[in-house]
Amino acid sequence: MAKQTLGSLLSSGFDLKGKRVLVRADFNVPLDPQGNITDDTRIRASLPTIQALAQAGAKVILTSHLGRPIQKDKATGAIQIAREGNSLAPVAVRLAQLLGQPVAFAPDCIGPEAEAVVSSLENGQVALLENVRFHPEEEANDPEFARKLASLADLFVNDAFGSAHRAHASTAGVTAYLQPAVAGYLVEKELQFLSGAIENPQRPLAAIIGGSKVSTKIGVIERLLEKVDKLLLGGGMIFTFYQAQGIPTGKSLVETDKLDLARSLMEKAKARGVELLLPVDVVVADRFDKDANAQTVSIHAIPEDWMGLDIGPESVKAFQAALQGCKTVVWNGPMGVFEFDRFAAGTEAIARTLADLTQAGAITIIGGGDSVAAVEKVGLADKMTHISTGGGASLELLEGKELPGIAALSEA
């Protein structure tokens, strides 16, 4: 079902002036030991929603998690909250700089301190509440905690796509008390690309799936086989497919309990007329190390004591040829161990190919996780049509699953 969005709410003439709007954002940003934000991408991604609400005269109340502050004592089971290094205070400072207006910071997300900050807001002003995960009730989706959080506001906007696959109090629980509950601009964009591009694609539609294990991508591959024209596989998972065909893989990573599954996926692709491409050559190493000895070999000539850590140059050429003329390309997962420069060439070549395709008019979608890091490493993030901000959420949406944080929103 289609969900209400902030865009549709504003265009319908809904008056937000003076309304207290609780916005669940994703400010889970990396901090250095001094508490400085090392990457503000997620904060920038939330700006359109915040600015639209402020311009409409709303009182904007932002909430988010940061890190995993809850630590359980293994021996006693006692819960401790690690506040050090997990406070959203640095985010309030950065947000104020980006918005060009003050951002009031509440030292808690519920209770008298939060209430005082919210009640001091004028129309168009912005406040940020402290980390919701400082309360164990957040991840337990506790109704009473959700009610307290919701009591600060009149309506709810979910703009935290990266947390949409979790049924937590601040992503799903609050919608029981706040209506309308709508998708912010970022969430709307993610749904448009990750769902829309696969349900109603411009064809040919190709998907590139990488990563080390087949087991983590089974759901995605199975769903994509029903939708795509071409499926290109890379990363460590390819060795399970080779071994399923009786090709020796040396010391490469193989999930021996997934050999039958790999065979059935290949058969499914054939039956559906999907062009399934596996690499024809690989870069192998004598050990898993950035300084390992490396050589490029055919997949039929992997030495017994070596392991494959990247796709080879012939595979890159074959993949590039297969992608030519594709109108939509979805990419999730690297082609090799791109953290080691020696085994990053395959991933970087695919990133450059997608950037070229985008320039030629194709829709390119980087579906979250490591492939985003890879594209950023090569400096091509701005050359793609859409870069997903989610990790697990992107994967689950590509699998066709309903995300709790989206399911809880008001119907359009």
Curated annotation (Swiss-Prot):
The keyword Kinase applies. Pathway: Carbohydrate degradation; glycolysis; pyruvate from D-glyceraldehyde 3-phosphate: step 2/5. Its EC number is 2.7.2.3. One of its GO terms (cellular component) is cytosol. InterPro entries: Phosphoglycerate_kinase (IPR001576), Phosphoglycerate_kinase_CS (IPR015911), Phosphoglycerate_kinase_N (IPR015824), Phosphoglycerate_kinase_sf (IPR036043). ATP binds at K217, G308, E339, G368, G369, D370, S371. Keywords: ATP-binding, Cytoplasm, Glycolysis, Kinase, Nucleotide-binding, Transferase. It is found in: Cytoplasm. One of its GO terms (molecular function) is ATP binding. Substrate binds at D26, F27, N28, R42, H65, L66, G67, R68, R133, R166. PROSITE patterns: PGLYCERATE_KINASE. Gene3D superfamilies: Phosphoglycerate kinase, N-terminal domain. The keyword Acyltransferase does not apply. GO terms for biological process: gluconeogenesis; glycolytic process. It catalyses: (2R)-3-phosphoglycerate + ATP = (2R)-3-phospho-glyceroyl phosphate + ADP. Pfam families: PGK. Belongs to the phosphoglycerate kinase family. HAMAP family: Phosphoglyc_kinase. Monomer. This is Phosphoglycerate kinase. It comes from Synechococcus sp. (strain JA-3-3Ab). The lineage of its organism: Bacteria, Bacillati, Cyanobacteriota, Cyanophyceae, Synechococcales. The gene is pgk.
